Regions:
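Nucleotide/phosphate-binding sheet-loop regions of phosphoryl- and nucleotidyl-transfer enzymes
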Residues: 1-184
Length: 184
């Protein structure tokens, strides 16, 4: 599997039916489509992410009444129901990669207020090891993440995720996949 950019990532997440928050890819001027999204998926907060480049600007906690103002800053963006609506339910967040040869990379945090980007900047656990390393047992809920990755055969792919203590997202599961990467 080759994922070259954020558009590829979103398409592959949809194709593989991975759990994610309701999300829509839009472009500058798509005000009516944005308002329709808010109506269909009512929430207190939305996340707005620049999808025109890697590591683009993102706002994790945009109040419902500020969304239209915020989207004017982007040429290509996604709007989604924000994980900020579930802060108190977040158990683990970050990115992981499980390799077919048994190697593991993980950069994760248990901080409930963290986004993936925050977790990678200030991780509680930042490891490059293998699946047999007992240190992985120290990471809360890591087995749940591994089980999801294995079940969906997401090997040799960097997976940005958050794990919750309740079911959320379009498929009502306790894990959300934000992005998957291979070649960017």
């Amino acid at each position: 599997m080759i994922i070259r950019n954020k558009i590829d990532s979103l398409e592959k997440i949809i194709e593989l039916k991975l759990n994610k928050f309701p999300e829509k890819l839009l472009k500058k001027g798509d005000i009516n489509e944005t308002l329709d999204f808010i109506k269909v998926y009512p929430a207190e907060f939305y996340a707005i992410r620049d999808k025109s480049k890697s590591c683009g600007n993102f706002k994790l906690k945009v109040p419902r009444d500020k969304v239209i103002e915020e989207i004017s800053n982007y040429d290509l963006f996604t709007i989604n129901v924000s994980s900020a609506n579930y802060e108190e339910n977040q158990l683990l967040v970050g990115e992981v990669e499980f390799f077919r040869n048994g190697d593991v990379y993980c950069c994760v945090s248990t901080n409930q207020k963290y986004s993936v980007r925050d977790a990678c900047k200030n991780p509680d656990f930042n490891l490059k090891t293998n699946i047999f390393d007992k240190t992985l047992d120290d990471i809360p809920y890591f087995d749940d993440v591994y089980e999801y990755i294995s079940r969906n055969e997401l090997y040799d792919i960097i997976v940005e995720f958050a794990l919750f203590d309740k079911n959320v997202g379009i498929y009502s599961e306790n894990i959300i996949i934000y992005e998957i990467r291979t070649h960017y």
